[in-house]
Amino acid sequence: MNKTLLKSVREYKKQSILAPILVILEVLMEVLIPMEMANIIDIGMTSGDLHYIIQRGVILVVMAMLSLFFGISAGNMAAVAGAGYAKNLRHDIFYKVQEFSFKNIDHFATSGLVTRMTTDITNIQMAYMMSIRLLARAPIMIILSWVMTLKYSVKVAILFLIVIPLLGGTLIFIAKKAHPHFIKVFDEYDILNNSVQENVNASRVVKAFVREDYEIDKFHGISKYVYTLFTKAEKIVAWNSPVMQFTMYVVILLLVAIGGTGIIHGTMGTGELTSIIVYALQIIGSLMMVTFVFVMIMIAEASTDRITEVLEEVPEMQDKADAVTEVKDGEIIFDHVNFSYAGEGGNLSLKDVDLHIRFGQTIGIIGGTGSAKSTLVQLIPRLYDVTEGCVKVGGIDVRDYNLEALRDQVSMVLQKNVLFTGTIYDNIRWGDENASDEEVQRMCKLAQADGFVNEFPAGYNTQIVQGGNNVSGGQKQRLCIARALLKKPKILILDDSTSAVDTKTDALIRKAFREEIPNTTKIIIAQRVSSIEDADQIIVLDDGKIMGVGTSEELLKTNDIYREVYESQVKGGEDDE
């Protein structure tokens, strides 16, 4: 467990400290119990002193009760500390991910983050809970049991001094041999989770292409490999128990031999031999405990590295101390912008983009697949940072803004529309959680969503399930547009967000934009010329470069790319969807 992860203990420090203290008290009682048993046998029973037997018996029962109390209390404290620690870790990772830029998120697969927040944190929780309890218990038990053994027999104590390091070393060797296999197992868990996630998310595609058998075989292959790796690790760990059992029986035989000789010669009592055997079992049991915890820590170590990787990831975008907190207007300037997803030295996705968009204008962006249309607009709310040049909003470099303030004034409807589990009201209110029902309904009317929403039996209280699988693609797009409008932003970006909407509805949405939100800068990325031909300016992108800027009429005269797209759609006819 490293310093980064231990910071998440926070309010559970008290339980984390009390658990080992209670364990030590429990161990103290357990170590004293065999001594009292020896006294009862060797003194009370030998002399036939019933009063002594009862007196010591009462003390024995009290010790047992105290041991039980301390043990239960320690277990409760350890459970609370472990569960609380895991809760804090999940919170810290989730909070950290919220701070990530797109570039940070690109470092981790979604399935990898899910595995970290579930399986990995559970492993760490178990290791932490065992560590604060068992790692305190085992060493104290071994030391005190050995000291008590030394009190009765130096020979037996020396025997333990030989056995303990040999056995401990063997068990640690076994655990270390298993560790690399556990690391591989958890790496494969990511792949397994990714396979499940892909299959569930794309279940309709799988069924449409009748690929169920292929997906089953793929999942079976990954699952079998995880099974093979885990089996290899467990086969190594399985040596623990036989080694411990063998050692235990050998030690007991030696103890009986040494103790029997002592009893015959009168140098050791029967009770003392009984106590020594109990101490031997306590020492061996403690070594087994240490090994078990050590194996768990080995498993958790792989998880620790993966969790630490997320927590120590430095968010690429951080607010300056004097960050600007107010966006004046929706004017946008791209000043000789170059951008590469790989950073400096990588292949440029945007090349020397120089652009001025006035506040309140409607801008259309068109270009072929891979021309960096989405990349261009993602720089405006600073989802990525430019590699060279700068992007200004309201006359200020976006890097000088407080991120929350900037993004609060930029509404973006992404290509992949996402709705969340909850009612339609809940989903639209992502734009403004304090919005009234009337405001939500008004924005849905602007987005041409009000009609189909009112056709649902529950209207705006209709539950959205599984990311919006109970609404059509066009309906989902309109709900996402309504959500974006509810923010009342200074800049509205539609990234191919009306592609599943028929041309008539598309035209009504654009008309609503012109009439109802004239003081919002609107950027519309589209594949259909009809979606942008009435824009104030149209930007033609090709391979990350601006190949033309102007109205539809101007571009038809001066730009071959735009003219080719326009003519192919007009002559071919646009399909109403």
Segments predicted by a language model, with ranges:
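Membrane-integrated ABC transporters
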Residues: 1-30, 37, 45-60, 74-78, ...
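Transmembrane helices of ABC transporter permease
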Residues: 11, 15-28, 60-63, 69, ...
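Hydrophobic alpha-helical transmembrane bundles that constitute the permease/transmembrane domains
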Residues: 20, 24-32, 65-72, 124-127, ...
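Juxtamembrane helix-loop junctions of ABC transporter transmembrane domains
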Residues: 21-22, 29-42, 50, 54, ...
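Short intracellular "coupling" helices and adjacent cytoplasmic loop segments at the cytosolic face
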Residues: 47-48, 83, 91-115, 119-121, ...
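Helix-loop-helix
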Residues: 48-55, 144, 148-162, 232-306, ...
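ABC-type nucleotide-binding domain
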Residues: 326-577
